[in-house]
């Protein structure tokens, strides 16, 4: 028995040694495999500044898209390039961008070791910016339970009221964090394409943070303006929050001029303006200005009409006669619109401004003219004290500055009648007096009356032209100013929709919460003609 046990022990040692050898071999192979499987060209982590740059490039709404058609600034008159009908389906929501923002926050915390950093401050603003814009499209949204990935794939919907309250809180936190970073002279910001890396007039990282703080508070005032129809709801504190900003400029700095705008700047090498010299032959005659925009300018004898449009020479007036600047009703059928444009009876895009190069004009996301009009509107509505006329005037003056309109002689340039090729222009000298312009009964501020409010809203609408996404449409939806034109060309039986439907995949990925949200808001019908909460209807 003892001999047998000794043999068994020998066998056990042999097997144990063999097993250890195999384990060591496998361990060695695994280590080598891990080493070989790591791609040295693939980063293990993405720096927060690269994530920020990615997010910032995703937030502009560029001109010549559907948004400016739906805001009735421009029209398509040729079927190949689409039409002027309003949407009939769902919105595109930016939850993917929001997830990138969350990743940026985590990476910034990992690399800086602090929850207070430029990326965290901008993340709060960007979240508010995106959630507000998404809610303006559809209504209620997943927010407080969103962005948790697999931890919660079916988040509940926050009411639109909750979305706005949470967004206003994010903006407050962003302002506070930015103030602290500025006070500590933080210079760690990178990847900011709008201020720190701006093509013309780039700012230092610290100066960029100061610009961003102004943007945050100016956007906050826009958010409050969107709540005008529900401003009496005490939970929103609309008047108080507006007053807080305007009464404490050191705590809540706001935009002070066009140079403070949050805007997208174009360049010829890449990121060209959508209408440019390369596509002159494709669409210059197949796109025209909308009556809601250019006819308003013409009626006011506003020189911006000659800066943005070509004269309608088929009408028989002089090139610099305001009667030559006529847009099409957005409700007109395409065939009729195309014939009118072809016969020179509609104003096309100004060739010199939009097709002579590749950089036309910057695209605002949060602009100084709008800010001025927002403050004027708040004063007119009695939310805050102040001089509405002064802010109204500043808004108009800044708009003329943007378009290069000055007191005295102005040069306006159009394509020459019978032009033989690109660049064949004719220029005129046209006098302009801001004092005379502002003295017109339709422009001179009527005071804090309904007429005065309509004047503010009209000029604010003009300031949204070809920028600021759907803000022109949202203002019409909120106030009815200006009057939008409808017909067969706008679709939807001549009715302008009030919202977008939710993305169709919500019905399959989050059905219970989706159905509950649609039921509570719209009686179970995800209808584009239904009014959302903030419209107060």
Language-model region placement:
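C-terminal functional modules
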Residues: 400-537
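Short, compositionally biased low-complexity segments
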Residues: 25-34, 70-77, 135-145, 265, ...
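Bacterial Sec-dependent N-terminal signal peptides
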Residues: 1-38
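Membrane-proximal, proline-rich intrinsically disordered regions
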Residues: 29-80, 85-86, 92-95, 103, ...
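Structured, solvent-exposed acidic/aromatic patches
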Residues: 72-126, 130-408, 446-451, 459
